[in-house]
């Protein structure tokens, strides 16, 4: 079955809140020997991007969007448990990941950090809604190897940019690797470099 058809089947089940139907799509993939490390980036991620894109363009209702994202989160959580059940060799690289301060949508970030953890990174993930001064304090206190900031909402860009600028200005963690991701950065080529990440 093609990836597009599979994504469409899962999408339809999700936006209709069809929990058994969504689980059936995943169970069929597992029966074919496809594990969570493939399902997450190759099925969950494109389905999530489709849901998010249609919602931003007002092509699906808020109800359908909520049904879809809540159910997809359940499926992602279940798959994440499978990912860490057979841990990868540790890379001795510590990642602190967060979403923007007003970011309520964390599902894409959650998938990314689940995959990082499954691939040997030590990950801490605060999600969204955390003020940037608290993120800065944690980074300065714990000195992670990587600060990974997700942003799908344009209103969070100024806060993330300010955080990055402040970390550079105060010389906090000179070896800190700054990484940004999420919808805003996917839609605006060169934005990550422009803000210093």
List each language-model region with its residue ranges.
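Long amphipathic alpha-helical segments
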Residues: 1-88
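Residue-level detector of anion-binding/catalytic polar loops
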Residues: 35, 122, 145
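Cytosolic, long alpha-helical scaffolding segments
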Residues: 81, 106-110
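A short, charged/proline- and glycine-enriched loop
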Residues: 88-95
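Residue-level signal for short, function-critical loop segments
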Residues: 99-103
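Short helix-loop-beta junction
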Residues: 110-124
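Cofactor-cradling patches in redox/metallo enzymes
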Residues: 117, 130-193
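A short glycine-rich beta-strand->turn/loop micro-motif centered on a GG-aromatic cluster
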Residues: 122-132
């Amino acid at each position: 079955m093609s990836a597009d058809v599979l994504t469409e089947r899962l999408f339809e089940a999700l936006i209709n809140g069809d929990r058994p139907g969504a689980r059936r799509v995943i169970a069929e993939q597992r029966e074919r020997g496809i594990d969570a490390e493939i399902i997450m980036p190759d099925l969950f991620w494109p389905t999530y991007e489709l849901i998010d894109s249609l919602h931003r363009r007002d092509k699906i209702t808020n109800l359908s969007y909520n049904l879809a994202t809540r159910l997809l989160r359940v499926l992602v959580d279940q798959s994440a448990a499978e990912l860490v059940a057979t841990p990868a060799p540790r890379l001795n690289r510590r990642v602190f990941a967060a979403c923007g301060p007003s970011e309520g949508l964390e599902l894409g970030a959650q998938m990314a950090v689940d995959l990082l953890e499954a691939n040997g990174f030590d990950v801490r993930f605060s999600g969204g809604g955390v003020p940037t001064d608290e993120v800065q304090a944690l980074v300065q206190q714990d000195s992670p190897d990587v600060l990974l900031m997700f942003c799908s909402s344009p209103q969070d860009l100024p806060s993330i940019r300010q955080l990055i600028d402040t970390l550079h200005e105060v010389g906090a963690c000179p070896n800190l690797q700054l990484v940004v991701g999420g919808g805003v950065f996917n839609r605006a080529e060169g934005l990550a470099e422009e803000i210093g990440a």
